[in-house]
């Protein structure tokens, strides 16, 4: 079991999205701590994000990476792009992503780009609307990817075959 876990950790790409210094005001002054937002993925449809907080930056990053590994979800991709246009929302952030042709690259900003890179998406057009808070953008992006349906899933739900769905 330990070998399997060690092997699993090695295949995952890790990306640090944001580190932030936060403070707590107490009677004697301020207490500073750090937060870190990270994403991990295998480059083949598995992604997870984590948010860690600690007194020191390395400890916050370590906590965030552990949380990201614990909360991995699987996304079905279509040859390095998406199956269809999708929207995702979390609090004040709205993200829109649509499939792109081969060679387009990842057209996305900041936090959304990091999530798409570790997920294994190579060609996508995207736009973030509303709040650009990195935590909300990451959650909205993961939400959009998780709710994306493949043609085989849609066909199974409708009781048809994939060729009838594609037209």
Curated annotation (Swiss-Prot):
PROSITE patterns, per the entry: RIBOSOMAL_S5, S5_DSRBD
GO MF terms held by the record: rRNA binding; structural constituent of ribosome
Residue ranges occupied by any S5 DRBM domain in the UniProt entry: 12-75
Keyword terms of this UniProt record: Ribonucleoprotein, Ribosomal protein, RNA-binding, rRNA-binding
Keyword Cytoplasm listed: no
PANTHER family in the cross-refs: MITOCHONDRIAL RIBOSOMAL PROTEIN S5
Entry note about domains: The N-terminal domain interacts with the head of the 30S subunit; the C-terminal domain interacts with the body and contacts protein S4. The interaction surface between S4 and S5 is involved in control of translational fidelity.
Function field: With S4 and S12 plays an important role in translational accuracy. Located at the back of the 30S subunit body where it stabilizes the conformation of the head with respect to the body.
The family this protein is said to belong to: Belongs to the universal ribosomal protein uS5 family.
Name of the featured protein: Small ribosomal subunit protein uS5
Organism in which the protein naturally occurs: Shewanella baltica (strain OS155 / ATCC BAA-1091)
